[in-house]
């Protein structure tokens, strides 16, 4: 059976929301690719070693899993989902057949969109001027 890599936003989301998104995306991928697919375990708990950047550490682990994939499903608009953007780029660059969903149109991804929108608002409050002393 061919293997499917599922890329979903994880930062700030509950385990339940992540698993629910993955389950729905699995079904979408099977319909899209026209065959039953084995899902690679891509949910990686953030257990980075001390001193490591947890987001980059998790991304590195997920890229190792991506090397085993025959197919890829992710999200289409990745502006605020940096790990998802990197995974999609790698899958495309290395010839893995890809499909994706629009996170703004999928109810099961609404929480991820809201979290990303909150991060966008936080960034607006970061001073952009540099003061030289």
Language-model regions, residue ranges each:
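Conserved catalytic or regulatory cores that recognize and/or transform ribose-phosphate-containing ligands
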Residues: 1-133
């Amino acid at each position: 059976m061919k293997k499917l890599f599922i890329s979903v936003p994880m930062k700030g989301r509950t385990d339940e929301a992540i698993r629910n998104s993955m389950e729905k995306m699995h079904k979408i991928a099977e319909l899209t690719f026209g065959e039953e697919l084995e899902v690679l375990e891509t949910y990686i708990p953030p257990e980075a070693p001390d001193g490591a950047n947890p987001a980059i550490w998790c991304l590195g682990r997920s890229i190792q899993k991506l090397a085993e994939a025959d197919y890829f499903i992710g999200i289409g608009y990745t502006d605020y989902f940096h790990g998802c953007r990197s995974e999609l780029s790698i899958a495309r660059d290395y010839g893995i057949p890809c499909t994706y969903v629009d996170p703004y149109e999928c109810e099961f991804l609404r929480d991820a969109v809201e979290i990303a929108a909150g991060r966008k608002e936080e960034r607006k409050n970061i001073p952009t001027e540099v003061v030289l002393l």
